[in-house]
Amino acid sequence: MKIVLNKCFGGFELSHVACLYLCELKGIDVHSYLAESKNDTYHFKKIDKSYKKSNVFECVWYLKNELPKMELSLEENWDFLEHIDLDFDGANRADLDLIRTVEIFGEAANPIYSKLTIVEIPDGNDFIIHENDGFESVVYGQNLGKA
């Protein structure tokens, strides 16, 4: 069984273009925005596949619907926002679409502080991912349970 781990300090994250591709594989219509907070207002800029994060503090939002406007204050009703949650915890690291995305994009699947690597463990094993400041390792076996 293949699983995806992050093998550098920083954290598990997909690059923007890899994230868009993964959404496409899953049949999710996605609208991506660069979000910046100033005082009590969020400013948004629509981004496409060519966008590359230039620093770790940039925040990209993946939404199910287009935003009706490019500025939203904290006092407004935000109920219309539907974030796309690509959960990369636990068993989801063996997700076939995630593995395919990392295989296809290779190094381009990595943003600034990730080095995604596909590792193989014997089929039928449970696994637990251990993380130290973003750097991950895996323990696998039968009936691992929870500690």
Per-region residue spans from a language model:
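Catalytic phosphate/metal-binding cores of nucleic-acid and nucleotide-processing enzymes, i.e., regions
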Residues: 1-147
